[in-house]
Amino acid sequence: MNDSSIAQVPDQGPLRRTVLQGAARASARRTAVLPALVLALVAALTGLTVPAAAQDDAGTSSSASTTAVAAAATFANPLNANGADPDIEYHDGYYYMMSTPYRGPLTMRKAPTIAALKAASPVPVFSDFPASRCCQVWAPELHRLSGPNGVRWYIYYSAGSGTLQSQRVHVLESSGADPLGPYTYKGMIFGSNDWWGIDGSVVTIDGRLYFTWSGVPTPLWADSDPSIYIVALANPWTVTGPRTRISAPTLSWEVQGTPMNEGPVAIQHDGRTFIVYSASACQGPDYKLGQLTYTGGDVLSASSWVKKSTPIFQRNDAAGVYGPGHNGFFKSPDGTEDWIVYHANSSATQGCGGTRTPRIQKVTWNPDGSPNLGAPLATSTAITVPSGEPVVDYHRVTNVATGKVIDVQAPNTADRARIGQYTWNGRPWQQWRFKDLGNGHVQLESQNSGKCLDVLDFSTADGASVIQWPCHGGTNQQFQWVSVGSSYQLRARNSGKCLTVAGGSTADAALLEQRTCGTGSAFLWSRTVS
């Protein structure tokens, strides 16, 4: 390990380094400030609780306006009301987004378009948080990697026992190919010593996998300046060999509020590798992004990394964007564009609490091959959607007899959630994608959960319940849209029976069931693009 040899900064004279005492540093870091911690915990709770206006399935009225989820040509930031340290992956037709929950569970949003992602509800993907890693759950990142068990999804996140000194990076592995899991805990990941570490990420260079994170050069976090480290991996959760510090906060723009380098994440283009990291204190408006460039040679040699002397992404007062940082990168659906996801505040007085919102914008490339992130865009800016986004229409499906729509009952992201009817309010659990299976049948996929309309247990009986369940293509998830005059029956392939409202009820939250098909209005439906 060579912690003293860090990335070289070209044409950069010596700069005075701000030295903070341990106590002062501890008061500046993330959730150590009590107001920031309170805001953070409120944000976490808010992010995992359905707003009152959206709790129609629990029986409360909803004043929510109609949510358009068909693919749009443009969108505006932010993606949702809170979400620090965001990460997005695009895979097999869907965006998957994670952000800091502060406490478990870890959740993920899934949607086929950015417009739908903004409306999607968080789905819990991992809930095992014992006392040793119960708290300060930060910065989850999702990566698809080849490991000992084949290609799997891995989540890297930071957590501890409740003190900042206890923070470490932890790793989860999926049991299969679904980014939504389930996941198993693989353990902590750290270098040759078990010292403080946060914000873990991975990068593959010349066919070898490496782990990058924000760590410290001494055992006590409060006595050290968090820096960027890299180490080789034997598998996605096990390091091998010594670590190397490739960046420390030494430049004037890296020490505003607190000397800080954190949140390293790689972006690669035309055979070149860059690591973008966050610098200065997140409590203030001057949190920003810097860049390291891999110049070739030994990846674990600090001399192979060159730090850019100026920040590449920072506050934009004219646009009302402050403290932009802790980013990730993802590809557009067609793979032709690179995009950045980051968090930012809308006021210079906001800091590390629940005011940080996730935002995205397109990355371009400078003539020298380095990434050009531009300036953070105002929330009023119309941004063209990522290239290759599918045109996905979602429909509300209305019962002719009652005038109410098919609705996933609370908890509306859960497997086996019951399907009922409810007054139309435009929420995503009332909107359905009709997926043509090419055999005269369709699947109805919930915009909210990505799960499918399903006759429970492949039942062929009258009165069988209708639920949502992960889409698998079985005959109990296949329906015919059968014309009856100007309306339609929804006829289940498995049973040949039709969906209707139980007992002919006109009440909100009345459940759907299957019955022998009839032509009365209770068996008839219409659909309208939302």
Give the positions of each predicted feature.
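Secretory targeting and sorting signals
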Residues: N2-I6, D11-D56
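Compositionally biased, low-complexity segments
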Residues: A23, D57-S61, E513
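Lectin-like carbohydrate-binding module/patch detector with strong preference for beta-trefoil
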Residues: P390-S530
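N-terminal non-cleavable signal-anchor helices
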Residues: P10, L20, L34, L39, ...
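Intrinsically disordered, low-complexity serine/threonine-rich segments
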Residues: S5-Q8, R30, A64-A68, W339, ...
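Carbohydrate-active catalytic/glycan-binding domains of CAZyme proteins
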Residues: G59, S65-V392
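N-terminal compositionally biased, intrinsically disordered segments and leader/signal-like regions
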Residues: S5-A7, V19, A32, G47-V50, ...
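Intrinsically disordered, low-complexity repeat tracts enriched in Pro/Ser/Thr
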Residues: D11-P14, A26, S62-T66, V400, ...
